[in-house]
């Protein structure tokens, strides 16, 4: 299958959505950094499997044995997708957030009075690669360069400053705010030279670039890696932790119960080997099937085609947006380097609240974007130049349930199926907003931080019911 063919296989690609004026228009989805739609071949594979679905492991019935075989075949496909060797294990989780929390739980907190290990991370991180590590040790942040990239010199300084104390470096494969791609293998080499390990949050990277954790004896090996299927055109509730086995082979599992034990008596419990010991209860077998199918589709199309298409879209969007004087872009704005980043672009419209821009695009343009801080508050505060005092004020307002004055940006993010025509449509709507020619009168719900047009409400039940 070619990319051109796969682009036509997006579920819901031609669905129309209602607009404020009573008309309908084909939906434009520029929110792929949050989640992607599924693909028709993935949907069909799930439907096909559901005829044979049964619970996995230890069942003697044909459907149970088939489901168990499919489950483990999928694990092999996923391991191959990231080039993991037999010193690593693929553990299924709900999503990237759970995967990183599961890993963090294995890095035990020191006893009272003992020196805490240092966890190095960056200001760029998604909260899911920041908050779990706060429980583990002393979290030290690598600074950012003026363009919002990770400061390589500060990274080196921190490695030297905390040499002998750094236990782990937690870094994102790519930013969900600016689309920057981090040189994780270069980082891995340096991290291993000082005797530490590295975990890569690859949630944003996985749909757009190949992931290579490399063999265990490679200096650039990624010790741990996590990603989610819902950002890879398989939103069926599965995530993956690719992990070195040894850290999970001692002690009790994080969650205990069915499927985690070899034998239980009233006095003892003896845990299974990986990965079963860390997959308590009935797993999301359907989600695993969906992820395996989309991986095979991506491999068939090839990442080169995906990268080329998304880079063209990103360059085109940057040129169009840069030509609009009232648009403020954040991060790298050079169309010539579009192939060195992801198609994630954050911007604001001068003099217009980011939440209002997003609302007008939705209600009057049928265009789905995301606005705010994208679960990366410190990073967005940094690129917006919010002072420490400003951050304290933001915290105060939120604790008072007032989200009407929060800083943020508008984010567009491309998938392999988006088009230049959709970007043109976005820019036309932005022009309407800049000229203040939009039709609705919008009011802010201060508790939610969202704008809605007066006298209008969505009748969702006319489109879908349970």
Regions found by a protein language model. Give the residues of each.
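Pyridoxal 5′-phosphate
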Residues: 1-466
């Amino acid at each position: 299958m070619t990319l051109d063919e796969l682009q036509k296989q997006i579920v819901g690609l031609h669905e129309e959505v209602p607009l404020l004026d009573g008309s309908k228009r084909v939906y434009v989805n520029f929110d792929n950094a949050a989640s992607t739609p599924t693909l028709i071949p993935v949907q069909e594979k799930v439907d096909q499997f559901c005829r044979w679905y049964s619970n996995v492991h230890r069942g003697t019935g044909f459907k149970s044995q088939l489901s168990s075989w499919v489950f483990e075949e999928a694990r092999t496909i996923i391991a191959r997708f990231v080039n993991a060797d037999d010193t690593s294990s693929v553990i299924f989780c709900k999503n990237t957030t759970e995967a990183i929390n599961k890993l963090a739980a294995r890095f035990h907190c020191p006893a009272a009075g003992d020196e805490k290990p240092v966890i190095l991370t960056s200001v760029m991180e998604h909260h899911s690669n920041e908050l779990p590590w706060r429980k583990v040790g002393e979290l030290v942040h690598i600074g950012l360069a003026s363009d919002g990239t990770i400061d390589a010199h500060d990274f080196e300084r921190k490695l030297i400053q905390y040499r002998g104390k750094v236990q782990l470096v937690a870094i994102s494969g790519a930013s969900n705010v600016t689309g920057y791609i981090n040189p994780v293998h270069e980082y891995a080499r340096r991290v291993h030279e000082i005797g530490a390990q590295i975990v890569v949050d690859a949630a944003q990277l996985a749909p757009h670039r190949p992931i290579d954790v490399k063999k265990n004896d490679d200096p650039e090996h990624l010790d741990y890696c996590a990603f989610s299927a819902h950002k890879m055109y398989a939103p069926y509730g599965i995530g993956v932790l690719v992990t070195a086995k040894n850290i999970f082979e001692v002690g009790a599992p994080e969650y205990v119960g069915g499927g985690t034990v070899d034998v239980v008596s009233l006095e003892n419990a003896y845990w299974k080997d990986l990965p079963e010991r860390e997959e308590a209860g009935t797993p999301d077998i359907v989600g695993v099937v969906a992820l395996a199918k989309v991986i095979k589709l991506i491999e068939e199309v090839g990442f080169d085609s995906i990268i080329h298409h998304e880079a063209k879209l990103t360059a085109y969007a940057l040129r169009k947006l840069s030509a609009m004087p009232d648009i403020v872009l954040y991060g790298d704005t050079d169309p010539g380097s579009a192939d060195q980043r992801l198609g994630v672009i954050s911007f604001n419209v001068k003099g217009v609240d980011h939440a209002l821009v997003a609302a007008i695009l939705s209600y009057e343009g049928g265009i789905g974007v995301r606005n705010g801080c994208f679960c990366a508050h410190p990073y967005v505060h940094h690129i917006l130049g919010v002072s420490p005092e400003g951050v304290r004020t933001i915290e105060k307002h939120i604790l008072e349930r007032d989200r009407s004055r929060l800083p943020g940006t508008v984010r567009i993010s491309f998938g392999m199926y988006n088009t230049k025509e959709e970007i043109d449509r976005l820019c036309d709507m932005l022009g309407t907003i800049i000229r203040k020619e939009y039709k609705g009168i919008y009011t802010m719900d201060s508790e939610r931080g969202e704008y809605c047009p007066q006298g209008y409400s969505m009748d969702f039940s006319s489109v879908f019911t349970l």
